[in-house]
Amino acid sequence: MATKLDTSSLLLALLSKCSLLTQTNLALSLLVASLASLALSLFFWSHPGGPAWGKYFLHRRRQTTVIPGPRGLPFVGSMSLMSNTLAHRCIAATAEKFRAERLMAFSLGETRVIVTCNPDVAKEILNSPVFADRPVKESAYSLMFNRAIGFAPYGVYWRTLRKIASNHLFSPKQIKRSETQRSVIANQIVKCLTKQSNTKGLCFARDLIKTASLNNMMCSVFGKEYELEEEHEEVSELRELVEEGYDLLGTLNWTDHLPWLSEFDPQRIRSRCSNLVPKVNRFVNRIISDHREQTRDSPSDFVDVLLSLDGPDKLSDPDIIAVLWEMIFRGTDTVAVLIEWILARMVLHPDIQSTVHNELDQIVGRSRAVEESDVVSLVYLTAVVKEVLRLHPPGPLLSWARLAITDTIIDGRRVPAGTTAMVNMWAIAHDPHVWENPLEFKPERFVAKEGEVEFSVLGSDLRLAPFGSGRRVCPGKNLGLTTVTFWTATLLHEFEWLTPSDEKTVDLSEKLRLSCEMANPLAAKLRPRRSFSV
């Protein structure tokens, strides 16, 4: 009996010791694993460019030239660079600090990124077939943009969309056809500004021009015409959808770069996308249904064009919704943002505004309104638009980045497949090695002297290519530039734009969302220039 008891006690004691040993080993194993993981993370982080680049170089098979750049922080890299509302300025300053203006590497969590602030390297990236794809963010995928021109993978489907848009929305013939529409909306803007000025004394043009730009795209894409002076439920609804979409696409989503965060959705981007998409589907489906119920001999707007496609070009309804949604989305913001920057510069530089007025009086006179056909003769005004594009590019980082499809060589350095590439157009446009006195507002630099070729901002010269270049150049660049120049000519022909006080200052603070807009809306006094107000 006693022996049995002693044996049982011994067994219990041994089991207890084994249990203790197992727990100790487990704790030690976890500690060793944690320390090893931390050491590895610190090793990755210590590499130029930060953790994502350190991980790549650990597994590389051949020695390659290191691309300089900031390490950032362990695990997250340089997320703070892109989280800033002045990301383009932060990146430019960092590139200068590391003497990496030609090519700089940094990490966004687990994402490898390269960025250039040099026009030659920018041309190499943007015109390379290796960078024909775009990295698709979670928000872009959720909002269906992976099935539209902006984010669709480079290939047959993307080329089909590009061809359809180029032929039926952005061709010179189509731009000419929509001239009357832009003229009508320009007249409506003038009426609204006159009314606002008479009522309040001050004018805040931002919201008005955004709504006008939205109306313009709704007319081209959906065939819907609205009076700018009246409130329309459909316009207000679409404006809310577009604003929410801008906010979602313009926010740096940490889960895109730190996959272990994806389950938590810390910024609620996935949740907000899930709420937005059904609303977009209902809105666009309603438009499509209306068009299907109508019978027309020939397409009258872009919805009709998409519905009439047949054969290999035929699109499914979800793809049609994605394409239409993107056209409205992309075609609204840039025009309004750029016009507000131009008007701000005119208020800040009354001498330059006076030169524009003199040109308008010479070419157009004060007895009639500006017509779109006048714009080709408005050389100085065109130079003003280009100079504002240089100082205040709406997409300072060219809005959407590129993605390396395969390993490649850029500026003599190996760039692996899967690397995100960015071009800091703002930095190039402010580089004293590229532009003389780059901080000075001087439209004359874009006025071609006799025998010189006019400077093009449409992508052929990477010293200033605000619409991008290469395969992924903005397809609506000609339409956007035409609209901006004509509406600006109208606003400056009809009014003199003045500071609201005697301080003669304008707040040029920036805020980078999806586009780089004025941080505070422009406030101005208007003085009519024509007795024949539209």
Swiss-Prot record:
Matching entries from InterPro entries are given as: Cyt_P450, Cyt_P450_CS, Cyt_P450_E_grp-I, Cyt_P450_sf, Cytochrome_P450_78A
Q: What is its EC number?
A: 1.14.-.-
Q: What is its main location?
A: membrane
Alphabetical UniProt keywords: Developmental protein, Growth regulation, Heme, Iron, Membrane, Metal-binding, Monooxygenase, Oxidoreductase, Transmembrane, Transmembrane helix
Name the phenotypic consequences of knocking out this gene. Slight reduction in seed size.
Q: According to its UniProt record, where is this protein located?
A: Membrane
What Pfam families does the entry give?
A: p450
Annotated Gene Ontology MF terms?
heme binding; iron ion binding; monooxygenase activity; oxidoreductase activity, acting on paired donors, with incorporation or reduction of molecular oxygen
**What tissues express this gene product?**
Expressed in the funiculus of developing ovules.
Annotated GO CC locations: membrane
Report the PROSITE patterns cross-referenced here. Answer: CYTOCHROME_P450 (PS00086)
Superkingdom of origin organism: Eukaryota
Q: How is this protein positioned relative to the membrane?
A: Single-pass membrane protein
Q: Give the protein's function.
A: Plays a role in seed and fruit development. Functions probably in association with CYP78A6 in the regulation of seed growth.
Other observations noted: The gain of function mutant 28-5 (T-DNA tagging) in apetala2-1 (ap2-1) mutant background show enlarged and wide pistils and siliques.
Its name, as the record gives it, is Cytochrome P450 78A9
